[in-house]
């Protein structure tokens, strides 16, 4: 199986710089996900093992006597790659971090929002993925990009149910997390063949996703994972939806800073912190969503 493979290995003693073992050390190879070792090491070296990413809830405008916020709620991203991740269930779901946000908003005396919930990813630029990534990869889970406001690993899951009698197309049974209305999933999966071969097509910020390929009739149910087109919007949508469940309704639909192209003076309300860097790397062995370490200065906003 490795007859035509290219292999390169180079190991040194970091204390003496002596070579321990090398095989084709100068060969040029595509590093793939092993490059995450470099970005993770850089993260720990520059930011430190006790660094915590912060996601901050802010608002602008004033809260009147009737509990109406005459302004917007903002989710200001701090580039936390673990926010809402399934790999950190205890940290983010005991209790659920979005419900914690809702309770903080309610405790502030806000009963209505004459404005919108706005996702703010401006810590990074709008380019989620490098220009060199293959277009056919971008809609899949391994094509998920990084941004100033990430959520749910920037991935959604689609549960399909197959037709055991091989008479029809597998149907979509459930999509998680909940899908915003403007995002459309087109199902072009068919039954046939001996192996599963499915691909998700779609670009960053594009609200149409096409799931295409074949699956064996023997698979009763199966999951397909895709990249979230606009994580900042999904964060705003998820909070807005949870607020409505608690009868706190916004007059405008959720949106993002990128969509609205503006910034308002915002007042800090609550911060959501990740685990320390060392725990993220050591305890969970998470594959970071960051394709590179971006460090930028962001001026402080007025705090309460």
What residue ranges belong to the model's regions?
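Beta-lactamase-like hydrolase cores
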Residues: 1-27, 54, 101-109
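Short active-site loop at a secondary-structure junction
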Residues: 22-42
């Amino acid at each position: 199986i490795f007859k035509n493979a290219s292999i390169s290995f180079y190991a040194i003693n970091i204390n003496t710089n002596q070579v321990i073992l090398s095989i084709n050390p100068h060969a040029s190879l595509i590093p793939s996900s092993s490059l995450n070792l470099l970005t993770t090491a850089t993260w720990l070296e520059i930011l430190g093992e006790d660094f915590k990413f912060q996601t901050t809830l802010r608002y602008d405008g004033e809260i009147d006597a009737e509990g109406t916020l005459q302004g917007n709620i903002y989710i200001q991203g701090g580039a936390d790659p673990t926010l809402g991740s399934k790999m950190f269930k205890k940290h983010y779901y005991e209790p659920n971090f979005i419900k914690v946000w809702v309770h903080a908003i309610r405790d502030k005396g806000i009963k209505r929002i004459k404005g919108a919930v706005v996702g703010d990813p401006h810590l990074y630029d709008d380019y989620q993925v490098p220009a060199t990534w293959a277009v056919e990869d971008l809609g899949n889970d391994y094509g998920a990009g990084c941004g100033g406001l990430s959520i749910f690993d920037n991935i959604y899951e689609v549960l399909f149910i197959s037709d055991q009698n091989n008479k029809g197309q597998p149907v979509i049974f459930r999509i998680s997390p909940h899908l915003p209305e403007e995002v459309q999933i087109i199902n072009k999966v068919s039954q046939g063949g001996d192996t599963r071969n499915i691909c998700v097509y779609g670009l960053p910020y594009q609200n149409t996703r096409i799931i295409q390929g074949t699956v064996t009739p023997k698979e009763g149910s199966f999951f397909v994972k895709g990249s979230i087109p606009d994580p900042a919007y999904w964060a705003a949508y998820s909070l807005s939806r949870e607020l409505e469940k608690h009868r706190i309704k916004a007059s405008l639909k959720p949106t993002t800073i990128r969509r609205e192209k503006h910034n308002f003076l915002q007042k800090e309300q609550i911060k959501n912190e990740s685990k320390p860097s060392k725990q993220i790397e050591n305890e969970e062995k998470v594959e970071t969503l960051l394709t590179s370490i971006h460090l930028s200065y962001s001026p402080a906003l007025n705090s309460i």
